Amino acid sequence: VHWTAEEKQLITGLWGKVNVADCGAEALARLLIVYPWTQRFFASFGNLSSPTAIIGNPMVRAHGKKVLTSFGEAVKNLDNIKNTFAQLSELHCDKLHVDPENFRLLGDILIIVLAAHFGKDFSPDCQAAWQKLVRAVAHALARKYH
């Protein structure tokens, strides 16, 4: 993926303002609520029976933070996203058997969460840069499947 200086600035500038715990928890909770079939990968998380249960679930919060923290690795390694996610791709493919389409869904949800949290700061240019990033991360995570 080729990044312009402006794209890098838009991504890193916004990332510096992201509350990883809150945005991560919200993104994962939204994924599980909006796309309920993704819940099957989180059976060990306990009660996922309703939106309220999902939002209040401490394991969802913790894993959401973990997921968004790994996204931070992409932000730090924009020029090497494939290698950055090689091990996670292997884990999600070989051990967890996650449908790679779910990575794209989570990326789309993250865009919605960022837009909700940052409003006007999440300009169309910023959204375009972040959309490119979530696509690159989803592609890197799906790499082991190809």
Swiss-Prot record:
One of its GO terms (molecular function) is peroxidase activity. One of its GO terms (biological process) is hydrogen peroxide catabolic process. InterPro entries: Globin (IPR000971), Globin-like_sf (IPR009050), Globin/Proto (IPR012292), Hemoglobin_b (IPR002337), Hemoglobin_oxygen_transport (IPR050056). Residues 2-146 form the Globin domain. GO terms for cellular component: blood microparticle; haptoglobin-hemoglobin complex; hemoglobin complex. Gene3D superfamilies: Globins. The keyword Acetylation does not apply. Red blood cells. Keywords: Heme, Iron, Metal-binding, Oxygen transport, Transport. It comes from the Eukaryota. PROSITE patterns: GLOBIN (PS01033). CDD domains: Hb-beta-like. Belongs to the globin family. PANTHER family: HEMOGLOBIN FAMILY MEMBER (PTHR11442), HEMOGLOBIN SUBUNIT EPSILON (PTHR11442:SF7). Heterotetramer of two alpha chains and two beta chains. This is Hemoglobin subunit beta. It comes from Aegypius monachus (Cinereous vulture).
